[in-house]
Structures are given as structure tokens and as C-alpha cells.
């Protein structure tokens, strides 16, 4: 029998018979590893323990201690277990697909009756029975005709369609436990008992179209979440409760920040309070960019398709563009324009105006660019996913030798901005060269090394996401962590030698010859709309004083105090504090409750005692005690608190 060489993570290699499975490899190392093993990585591919290995390879055996692999398998197996439970409870239900998603999985079903909360409880109960039965998971490769015949015989039209869509040169893998079988690429655990029975929960039912196409049949999608332990599940469910309390859509109504309506789907109607947050954040970012050497520009929102064709976006992104057709005077045909979905091609046009020298580089062009992208109605979510948004976008034109220093400076800027906004921790992911790419390996080596050196230079931790870079260059993604532990990908840094080439960007080098600059795409917030949504939820509406739309309400206790209330408001406004008066004929406790719901950080209560002493009674949001302060003292303190950082 032919032999193959398998190399382990410690660099040691061993000879094995060709066709050996990872399960057999694990057992050959130790009996305990054979029992603990759940899957393997073979040449970087997540591999089922039952799959044979036919050639030399690098191998790593995974156990439940390997978080990423364990969760993927648990959630994937639960998708199959749930589908089986549904069909055992309601045999007429047709199954479709059930992928792993963030924190869990979903499965789409074709059923005439709507799934109810009681149905979800019954499904969960049956799932736990399947898990506790500890049935072996088996897999086989089938011929296409056999798979089609199998599903046609069982009346599963969606599975027939899936099999028919698989390229003829690809094998068709089947998995089953008990008597229930499903089409699946795998991998899976080795028996149902490896799934924690107390660490999952079915969450909700939603409508979904087959293959995401509204022209197709509408299905029912059941979502579930799963973790390795019961405590992790409880922590996640608690986080969801907290997230519901912090929902920016609910707080947006209470604080009178914004609204959305069906006449302009995915477009934000900013109210005065919300627009104040937006403008303050924009002023802050403008100041930080100015300090960092960026030059602010403004480019058109409606741009002819010719530019999008030249940049390559028309071919790759047309379906997500808003197209505007115009009948130009004396023109033979309509002019086709698009609302810009991104700013980068327009920034190259600004760069291309006038001859550039190496002495002009790096050139940092920033824009608070208004963009529009078509998002399906089902994917939109408050401020978090919209069709019209503004990016804190910038592009750095530089030489290859300047990439490292520009990247390091950007990471330091991003870190400082996040801290100012209340986010002390973030993660960096470096996405490296994909299999299909342009450029030489030498060029990729240089830019990937430049990014890694930049990260190390600023002392940041990072992880590598192999093969997930764009076809033209590597990128960094920055994920911040909010107050309840959720991670949000906001910042990006993308190296791009491609767009300058497509759009003819050049500079005269020190050698007197023409060269192509590198273009570095970068953003810190991502979009203002989404980031404001994140801020609202992170702070549960209790924004930092400098960012709060209504910073101070000066409330009268008696009407005789109204003139002094007006004086206090005027003194605060003169020092840049956003202050307003509340002299309504209402009790002070009513006013305090109302403004607390509106998340006003500071309420100054004024009665005749304060008038006579020229003082104020200070109540801060979330506190029950009050503090008496002199007028000059409180104005100085609040004016200092109101200053925009940086």
C-alpha cells in the first residue's frame, strides 16, 4: 500500500498508509486523543474525521478545546438535528438549506402552517432526545443520479434542485444519523451526543425566499443559537436582553433623534437632536483628520457610468447601484449615471488633476462622502443597515516605501479616536493574499510585511485571516468591542495598486520616470449612520457630555425663578454649552423624569433659594443625589466638559 507523509503542528512528520482517516491518525497518537478528537485541519481545510487523506499533507487534530472548530461543528450538527426533528414531528415538511451563521444557525422549511412558539418548544424537546440517543454520524460520496433519484423518491424538490446545481466534476456528499439523511459538504461531529444538549436554544421564525429570490416560494426560517456550555448560552441570552434595552431604534424615538419611513426606505430622517449628534461627530472627525495631515475634498454624488466602467465597479457592483437615466438635450441616447456607492474612483479624479511628484506623496484626501447602495428590504435595520449613508472616507496616495509608516500612523489615529469615543479595546485582522490575485508574490510579500511591521510598531495585537484579502491587495479590519461585549467591524485599511492603474494615476519619481502610486483606502467609523447607532447602544443613550445633543436643561421650580433660568441658559450658551430652559408650569419631579427619559446628561433645578444665592442645584443623569454649585463654577465646569476632544 502506498504511504503518505503527514506533518504535525510541531513540525514532526510521520508515515501513514494512503487513505488513512484523521480519526485513525488521532487514535494512533493516543487513545485519549482518539476519544477527544472532533475534526482535523488538513492543509488548512477543515476536515471530517471520517474523510480519507490520500496525499502528503500538514495535519492538526481538533478537540472541543479548539473554540472556532468546535462551535462550527456544534452549530452545523444542530442545523441537521433540527431539520430531522422537524420532519419527524411533521413528515410533510420539505427541507432546503441550513448554514452556520454568527452565534448559531438557521434552516429553511417549506410548510403550509406557520411555526408557532409552541412548535419551537416541541422541536427543541425532540432535538434533545436525538442528541441524548448518541447516534453515529455517517457519511458517503454518491453518484449524482443516485442522489437525484433518492430525493425525487422522497418528494424533496429543493434538494433535487441543489444536487442539479452542483458542478458535474464535484462529488456529492451525504450525511446521516439514525434514519435521517441530508446533502452536505461537512464536516460534522462523530455522533449526536457530542453536541451539548443544554447549550442551544431556538430563537425565532422568519420568512425567507428560496435562494433569496422574491420570485421564488416563500419559506419559513427557524433561527437557533448554540455555544459550548450552558453558562455561555445564558450569558448570550442576557446580552440579548441588554441589547433589547439599548436598541437604538427604541432610544432614537425616546430621544427624538431620527426616524425612517416607507416613502424613503433605508434613508434617514434626522431630527434636530440626532442631527446635532451627527454634526458634533463630524466636527470631531474633521479636527482629527486635519491634525493628521489630511486634506478634505468634496466629490459629486451622481457620476456617469463611464467612470464606473473604467474603475471596474459597473461590472462588479451594478446590481447594488441606484441608476439615474437622463435625457440630455440634443443627445442621441439617454445618459446613464449612478449615485456613487463608494468614493474611491472620484478621489482618483481629484488626484489626477495636475502633475504629481514623489515630493507630493503621501497625499491624504478625505471626504465625508455621501453614498447610496441598494440593500434588500429584509436586510435593512435602523441605522445599522441603510441605503443612503455617509462614510468617513479617505484615500492615501503613496509610494510602496511609505505604506508601512502610513499604516502605523493610521492605526494610532484610529486607536485614539476609538478611545475618545469610549471604546478602549479593538481587534485587528490581517487578510492576506487569495489564491486568485494580481501582482507578483514578491509584491505581495512586501505589502503584507509592511502591514505586519506597522501593527508591531504600534504594539497592537492581531490575527491573520489567510486568503481573505482582495484580489489586488491585503487589508486590515478593525473590530471594536462595546459595553455588552458585542464586536463591531468599523475600521478598514486596504492596500490597492489596482485602481490607480485602471484610472491612470501617476507621479514622477525621483528618477524622473512615471510611476503608479499605491492607493490606501481607509475608514475609522465606517459610516456615520451605523457608528451613531453603535454609540447609542454602547452608551444606552447616555452619550458623553460633549456628544449629547441636549447637554443641559435648566428647569424652574417656581415661575418667579424664570428670569434667572434665562440668565443661566444664556451664560451656558455663551460658553458653547447646548442648554435650554424648561419653565413649563409642571412639577420639578415631572420635568426631571421627562428629561431623564430623553437622556439629558445634566439638569439644573432652580428655585428661589438658588435665585437668591446665584447658584444652581445640579442633578446628573443616572444619579439621585443633587449638588449645589455657584453659577460661575458650574458654567466653567460644563463648558470644559462640552469641549470636543482633540
UniProtKB/Swiss-Prot annotation:
Known catalytic reactions: tRNA(Thr) + L-threonine + ATP = L-threonyl-tRNA(Thr) + AMP + diphosphate + H(+)
Record-stated family: Belongs to the class-II aminoacyl-tRNA synthetase family.
Family matches, as NCBIfam families: thrS
One GO cellular component, as annotated: cytoplasm
Main function: Catalyzes the attachment of threonine to tRNA(Thr) in a two-step reaction: L-threonine is first activated by ATP to form Thr-AMP and then transferred to the acceptor end of tRNA(Thr). Also edits incorrectly charged L-seryl-tRNA(Thr).
Domain TGS, first and last residues per copy: 1-63
Catalytic as annotated region, ranges: 247-544
Top enzyme category: ligase
UniProt: Zn(2+) binding residues: 344, 395, 521
Name this polypeptide is given: Threonine--tRNA ligase
EC number: 6.1.1.3
Pfam families xrefs: HGTP_anticodon (PF03129), TGS (PF02824), tRNA-synt_2b (PF00587), tRNA_SAD (PF07973)
Record note on cofactor: Binds 1 zinc ion per subunit.
Gene3D superfamilies cross-referenced by the UniProt entry: 3.10.20.30, 3.30.54.20, Anticodon-binding domain, Bira Bifunctional Protein, Domain 2, Threonyl-trna Synthetase, Chain A, domain 2
Cofactor(s) in the UniProt record: Zn(2+)
Coiled-coil region list: none
Domain of life: Bacteria
Main location: cytoplasm
HAMAP family (UniProt xref): Thr_tRNA_synth (MF_00184)
InterPro entries associated with the record: aa-tRNA-synt_IIb (IPR002314), aa-tRNA-synth_II (IPR006195), aa-tRNA-synth_II/BPL/LPL (IPR045864), Anticodon-bd (IPR004154), Anticodon-bd_dom_sf (IPR036621), Beta-grasp_dom_sf (IPR012675), TGS (IPR004095), TGS-like (IPR012676)
Gene Ontology terms for molecular function: ATP binding; metal ion binding; threonine-tRNA ligase activity; tRNA binding
Species for this entry: Cereibacter sphaeroides (strain ATCC 17023 / DSM 158 / JCM 6121 / CCUG 31486 / LMG 2827 / NBRC 12203 / NCIMB 8253 / ATH 2.4.1.)
Gene Ontology biological-process entries: threonyl-tRNA aminoacylation
Amino acid at each position: 500500500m502506498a504511504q503518505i507523509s503527514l506533518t504535525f503542528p510541531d513540525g514532526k512528520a510521520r508515515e501513514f498508509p494512503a487513505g488513512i482517516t484523521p480519526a485513525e491518525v488521532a487514535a494512533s497518537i493516543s487513545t485519549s486523543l482518539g476519544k477527544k478528537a472532533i475534526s482535523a485541519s488538513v492543509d488548512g481545510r477543515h476536515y471530517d474525521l471520517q474523510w480519507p487523506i490520500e496525499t502528503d499533507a500538514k495535519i492538526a487534530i481538533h478537540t472541543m478545546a479548539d473554540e472556532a472548530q468546535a462551535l462550527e461543528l456544534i452549530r452545523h450538527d444542530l442545523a441537521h438535528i433540527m431539520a430531522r426533528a422537524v420532519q419527524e414531528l411533521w413528515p410533510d415538511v420539505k427541507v432546503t438549506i441550513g448554514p452556520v451563521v454568527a452565534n448559531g444557525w438557521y434552516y429553511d422549511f417549506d410548510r403550509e402552517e406557520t411555526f408557532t412558539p409552541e412548535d419551537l418548544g416541541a422541536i427543541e424537546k425532540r432535538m434533545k432526545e436525538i442528541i441524548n440517543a448518541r447516534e453515529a454520524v455517517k457519511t458517503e460520496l454518491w453518484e449524482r443520479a443516485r442522489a437525484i433519484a433518492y430525493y425525487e423518491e422522497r418528494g424533496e424538490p429543493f434538494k433535487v434542485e441543489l444536487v442539479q446545481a452542483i458542478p458535474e466534476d464535484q462529488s456529492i456528499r451525504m450525511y446521516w444519523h439514525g434514519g435521517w439523511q441530508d446533502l452536505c459538504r461537512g464536516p460534522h461531529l462523530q455522533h449526536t451526543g457530542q453536541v451539548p444538549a443544554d447549550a442551544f436554544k431556538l430563537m425565532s421564525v422568519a420568512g425567507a425566499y428560496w435562494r433569496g429570490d422574491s420570485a421564488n416560494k416563500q419559506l419559513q426560517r427557524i433561527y437557533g443559537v448554540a455555544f459550548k456550555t450552558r453558562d455561555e448560552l445564558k450569558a448570550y441570552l442576557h446580552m440579548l436582553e441588554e441589547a433589547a434595552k439599548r436598541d437604538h431604534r427604541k432610544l432614537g424615538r425616546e430621544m427624538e433623534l431620527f426616524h425612517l419611513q416607507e416613502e424613503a426606505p433605508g434613508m434617514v430622517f434626522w431630527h434636530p437632536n440626532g442631527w446635532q449628534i451627527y454634526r458634533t461627530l463630524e466636527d470631531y472627525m474633521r479636527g482629527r483628520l486635519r491634525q493628521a495631515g489630511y486634506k478634505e475634498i468634496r466629490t459629486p454624488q451622481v457620476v456617469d457610468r463611464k467612470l464606473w466602467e473604467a474603475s471596474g465597479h459597473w461590472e462588479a457592483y451594478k446590481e447594488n447601484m441606484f441608476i439615474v437615466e437622463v435625457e440630455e438635450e440634443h443627445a442621441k441616447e439617454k445618459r446613464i449615471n449612478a449615485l456613487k456607492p463608494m468614493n474611491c474612483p472620484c478621489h482618483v479624479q481629484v488626484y489626477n488633476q495636475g502633475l504629481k511628484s514623489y515630493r507630493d506623496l503621501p497625499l491624504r484626501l478625505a471626504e465625508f462622502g455621501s453614498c447610496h447602495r441598494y440593500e434588500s428590504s429584509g436586510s435593512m435595520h435602523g441605522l445599522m443597515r441603510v441605503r443612503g449613508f455617509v462614510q468617513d472616507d479617505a484615500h492615501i496616495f503613496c509610494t510602496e516605501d511609505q505604506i508601512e509608516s502610513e499604516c502605523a500612523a493610521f492605526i494610532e489615529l484610529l486607536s485614539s479616536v476609538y478611545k475618545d469615543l469610549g471604546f478602549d479595546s479593538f481587534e485587528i485582522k490581517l487578510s492576506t493574499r487569495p489564491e486568485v490575485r494580481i501582482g507578483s508574490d514578491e509584491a505581495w510579500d512586501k505589502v503584507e510585511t509592511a502591514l505586519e511591521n506597522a501593527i508591531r510598531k504600534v504594539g497592537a495585537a492581531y490575527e491573520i485571516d489567510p486568503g481573505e484579502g482582495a484580489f489586488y491587495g491585503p487589508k486590515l479590519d478593525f473590530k471594536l468591542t462595546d459595553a455588552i461585549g458585542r464586536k463591531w467591524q468599523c475600521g478598514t485599511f486596504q492596500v490597492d495598486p489596482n485602481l490607480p492603474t485602471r484610472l491612470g494615476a501617476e507621479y514622477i519619481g525621483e528618477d524622473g520616470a512615471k510611476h503608479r502610486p499605491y492607493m490606501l483606502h481607509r475608514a475609522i467609523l465606517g459610516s456615520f449612520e451605523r457608528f451613531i447607532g453603535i454609540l447609542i447602544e454602547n452608551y444606552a443613550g447616555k452619550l458623553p457630555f460633549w456628544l449629547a445633543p441636549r447637554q443641559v436643561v435648566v428647569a424652574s421650580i417656581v415661575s418667579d425663578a424664570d428670569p434667572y433660568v434665562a440668565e443661566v441658559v444664556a451664560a451656558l450658551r455663551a460658553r458653547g454649552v447646548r442648554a435650554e430652559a424648561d419653565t413649563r408650569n409642571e412639577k420639578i419631579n415631572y420635568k426631571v423624569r421627562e428629561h431623564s427619559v430623553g437622556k439629558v446628561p445634566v439638569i439644573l433645578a432652580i428655585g428661589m433659594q438658588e435665585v437668591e444665592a446665584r447658584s444652581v442645584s445640579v442633578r446628573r443623569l443616572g444619579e439621585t443625589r443633587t449638588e449645589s454649585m455657584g453659577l460661575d463654577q458650574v458654567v466653567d465646569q460644563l463648558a470644559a466638559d462640552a469641549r470636543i476632544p482633540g
